[in-house]
Amino acid sequence: MMSLRLFSILLAAVVSGAQGWGYYGCNEELVGPLYARSLGASSYYGLFTTARFARLHGISGWSPRIGDPNPWLQIDLMKKHRIRAVATQGAFNSWDWVTRYMLLYGDRVDSWTPFYQQGHNATFFGNVNDSAVVRHDLHYHFTARYIRIVPLAWNPRGKIGLRLGIYGCPYTSNILYFDGDDAISYRFQRGASQSLWDVFAFSFKTEEKDGLLLHTEGSQGDYVTLELQGAHLLLHMSLGSSPIQPRPGHTTVSAGGVLNDLSWHYVRVDRYGREANLTLDGYVHRFVLNGDFERLNLENEIFIGGLVGAARKNLAYRHNFRGCIENVIYNRINIAEMAVQRHSRITFEGNVAFRCLDPVPHPINFGGPHNFVQVPGFPRRGRLAVSFRFRTWDLTGLLLFSRLGDGLGHVELMLSEGQVNVSIAQTGRKKLQFAAGYRLNDGFWHEVNFVAQENHAVISIDDVEGAEVRVSYPLLIRTGTSYFFGGCPKPASRWGCHSNQTAFHGCMELLKVDGQLVNLTLVEFRKLGYFAEVLFDTCGITDRCSPNMCEHDGRCYQSWDDFICYCELTGYKGVTCHEPLYKESCEAYRLSGKYSGNYTIDPDGSGPLKPFVVYCDIRENRAWTVVRHDRLWTTRVTGSSMDRPFLGAIQYWNASWEEVSALANASQHCEQWIEFSCYNSRLLNTAGGYPYSFWIGRNEEQHFYWGGSQPGIQRCACGLDQSCIDPALHCNCDADQPQWRTDKGLLTFVDHLPVTQVVIGDTNRSSSEAQFFLRPLRCYGDRNSWNTISFRTGAALRFPPIRANHSLDVSFYFRTSAPSGVFLENMGGPFCQWRRPYVRVELNTSRDVVFAFDIGNGDENLTVHSDDFEFNDDEWHLVRAEINVKQARLRVDHRPWVLRPMPLQTYIWLEYDQPLYVGSAELKRRPFVGCLRAMRLNGVTLNLEGRANASEGTFPNCTGHCTHPRFPCFHGGRCVERYSYYTCDCDLTAFDGPYCNHDIGGFFETGTWMRYNLQSALRSAAQEFSHMLSRPVPGYEPGYIPGYDTPGYVPGYHGPGYRLPDYPRPGRPVPGYRGPVYNVTGEEVSFSFSTSSAPAVLLYVSSFVRDYMAVLIKEDGTLQLRYQLGTSPYVYQLTTRPVTDGQPHSVNITRVYRNLFIQVDYFPLTEQKFSLLVDSQLDSPKALYLGRVMETGVIDPEIQRYNTPGFSGCLSGVRFNNVAPLKTHFRTPRPMTAELAEAMRVQGELSESNCGAMPRLVSEVPPELDPWYLPPDFPYYHDDGWIAILLGFLVAFLLLGLVGMLVLFYLQNHRYKGSYHTNEPKATHDSHPGGKAPLPPSGPAQAPAPTPAPTQVPTPAPAPASGPGPRDQNLPQILEESRSE
């Protein structure tokens, strides 16, 4: 409904504007058709650079004289026009162009108004070369006859060069002039008027601060009033009031400032129902009218400029308007035109003129850093008298400086802290200083009169009677030769103006020196005095605090070219009062180390809602936010019915319903206890009918379930557990008994809380009564901080475009391992043909986070660079970016802010028309791969999880791949999250491959063996000493089994359903430890083998003592395990069948203390226990042998028995605790390190083999790692625009031309194919009967004449060799005829 109404407002505005103001099609080029006399300039450089050559696309261009101190180009449009755009070019084929300029306009050549762009910036950007046309479409259309362009900067390699185009249309002006005692009224044609929509529009200009512009009213309290108060425009409107309506209808809105500047200001009011717009000079203020009515009921007339007749008594305190009003439009009726025509429905009060009679004071604009105006005076007079008028916003500035004659000293008038300070310094005497006035920097005109003569001085401000300041002091006055207004020139020694005051910035007029009015026209043309950096006949003051760029009710204070914001008592901070001062929840205070108490929170951050005070119940694991209200005590209700129910509104302390709703919406859990007691009063009545009583929650939604129940069902708590008094009912109170019953419980559905009203409707019977009781709202948690989403390649989320007006702040956390990607981007409509506004935050490189934007000043970016670490380290990083009219800044984590101040008068309007992309740039370019969470834009959290779509590559949360992997990591591989996929870390396994599923083995020839040193003798001694002190072995705790705690761990060869007993959890590697990690209280051994020979030793672990471990094949081909722990050996027969069948076999042995777990192939897991006489430790492991034992020292005879001739076959997947010798041998890059080369030795031929094992699954290549990957619906992105259309037409034209040429070539070359033409005469028919031809004469044979045929010409027979006959000698010879047979 809201969007429909706003659309209707815009539609009404367009229709009314098109008919009443001529906007439609107002785009004519106005300079080209003008005569040469309409183009003028301050000067010209040469004969072919005069103003007449300044037309757009002309053969030359205008250039002023070198040294012209105030160059300008002026256009006389011959009549008033509406102007909508201006375009510039440089001088043709030259290095002369203007880079910045000012646009002035007016109705006469001696009074100019600067055009201010949005942001109160009077400077337009110009050209960068001599040929390109730079066009500026103005944000509002103004009316003028004269246009003046003032160049401010130009190409430093050339000079000023300009060609100009102005776009608009003719404008019909109907002007009414009021002198303060005049007024007119317009009577409706059909008496009273009633309307759903209205449009009021007009233009005005004045020098007064107060005045009534328009007024109309009705008998039912309806009225519309537009007036000036303090040079601000005020709109008062009401759609009526009624005693039965609870809300008053009066609404007042304000716009603009310093509107008494004698410039035309355009006003427009659009209303549709209660939705309304107030437009002033292009700035639109949208608002909603108070009250409940939607139609405007007016009596029979509208008053313009004041009140007429008896209506004056209604607004007797209002001043009539003094100034000019133009084209007053009411609902497509031009009242001003009717007044000019003296229509019968127009009533006049006083002498209303039909042309402007405003004075022309010729002001001077002081806007430069070293501006001044110097005028001569009458020297050596005994009385110094100066007067002038000024207006400014600045607190300080030099108003006047004059050096006294005869070296007596000087006189200074300066503005300081809003008052005029006078300083008279004389040689040999104490300086005289005094002040006058108060708050003279208010932007209005103030008149200063200063007189100094012998022994006394006097100054008066604004000719206020009795307010002048008189000072008696011994003075000797002799006037000097020069008076400096607005500042001192540089260097001061040359001009004799020595003042340490800053230059004055503002406007001055009516300068008088020694009682004589200064002729400023002579000053402008250098015929009197001197000046620098000033503009004549214009005043460029503007109200930079209207509209107010200080947010959250911050106070705006302005100077000549800037403004500042004071944010005290607002709850916000920053240059525009945008940044929240308080934390968003009690949970944030808990995390910062606070204790329970009252705190101020701001749930929506920098959003529009105000902060408020709550009680924070801070506990160890959570913080409860408690919001109290005015219904904490029992409320009794009687006499209510369903027709006239009781409305129990809940007013929360220190907060509105919207602010409390924002708290609940941001919380993880909320609850509110509600209790309803009844005496002969019903609650719900039936489960399907409309209830007697209910409660209203967030967004004014009605809810029919009560405490302890669930949303969507019309029940109380007893209705869920079937414990109501009457089992057939769903609430205790529905029993309707003459005794007190109660339904109570907690309301816990967050999206419905808080409770805002309780409606009770069944207490109108005799002796019936109801009571309700509501406890405070209690919430905890923060569901916005962990609103997380994961992105895969090419995925992105689309949200509605940013609507941020003048400020935008973005904050979010990201986590990624990708080197680059765009976090978010929003593009807007084009500024011009080649540029579009945008805002983008991205990870540009692994060490750079960039905030890039274009708000109209070109591409700009801020970069946070990291030297100490990379941002793609798979850790969470906080990004905060902010942009407003004062500055742009960026911060990552706790690094310092990267800040860039905006140029003065920068305007930002961050309302885009394209979708906001999260996770990529527009059209899914430069996608981000990783996780984002807690993304906020101006305090509003984007629901990332709610937009997650697995089919498009986005998933909620930042984990999940390793929790439920598609293929697990085998053999103890560690699962590593990679956002759009996962990888398996196989470093601690004896396998490789994507899922640690590829066997790494070696084929052992007879006599081949491998040794891997587990530790040196020195480390063994250290280990023994550590064991004696009962300290944990470096790297692992007792009972460690590698991979046991790894997500996705699948024990190799343990078979289905295998689970290790609950022994102590493994330890973690010690940082900095680099040697092989061992464990004396347990081992885990796994490997595969295949062989056809026996006996052999497959694996042997030796020690520096007599302990060892061995797995061997006996003579009969069976597999045996031998342990030597302590003094006595332990022998276990692993298989009873031979394993020398040439097939792969797997072995997995795990020992934990005296418990031994064994699995061979896929046979069931067996468990063995060592005797208590056997030690539980494998002391001082020394080396690991594969294929054959080549250990020195004493070796068990049984091992020696099976050690010769050695193993012949294949071993793979060998792992002893964390040692994988075959993987180390085959996968370590060459050359090896010296330490590793010393630890590992191979004797004989050992070649890599997987021993015939097949991988468990076919590995897949993730999209990010596949260079040839394309998504299923890979789009083609292009941004060629209209260039692509032109290229398409050009290619089509060339193809058509080529086809046409081929067709013509074909027709030309095959036109006569198969035929020939001759010049033979037609055959002569004889007169013989039957039409037979005569016989040929005797002699040489002749070819018969061809017989005519309609479709074929027969080929003649070849002539004989003797040549043609006599009759054929005159015929043309044909090539075929000349050939012989």
From Swiss-Prot:
Residues 1306-1381 are cytoplasmic. Residues 577-796 form the Fibrinogen C-terminal domain. CDD domains: EGF_CA (cd00054), FA58C (cd00057), LamG (cd00110). Residues 1317-1381 are annotated as: Disordered. Residues 21-1284 are extracellular. One of its GO terms (biological process) is protein localization to juxtaparanode region of axon. Keywords: Cell adhesion, Cell junction, Disulfide bond, EGF-like domain, Glycoprotein, Membrane, Phosphoprotein, Repeat, SH3-binding, Signal, Transmembrane, Transmembrane helix. Residues 1-20 form the signal peptide. Glycans are attached at residues 121, 129, 277, 421, 500, 519, 598, 654, 665, 764, 805, 844, 861, 949, 957, 1079, 1148. Residues 544-576, 962-996 form the EGF-like domain. Residues 204-356, 390-539, 814-958, 1089-1251 form the Laminin G-like domain. It comes from the Eukaryota. Its main location: membrane. Predominantly expressed in brain. In myelinated nerve fibers of the CNS predominantly found in paranodal axoglial junctions. In unmyelinated nerve fibers of the CNS diffusely distributed along the entire surface. Weak expression is detected in ovary, pancreas, colon, lung, heart, intestine and testis. Residues 1319-1329 have a biased composition (Basic and acidic residues). It is a single-pass type I membrane protein. Belongs to the neurexin family. Interacts with CNTN1/contactin in cis form. This is Contactin-associated protein 1. It comes from Rattus norvegicus (Rat).
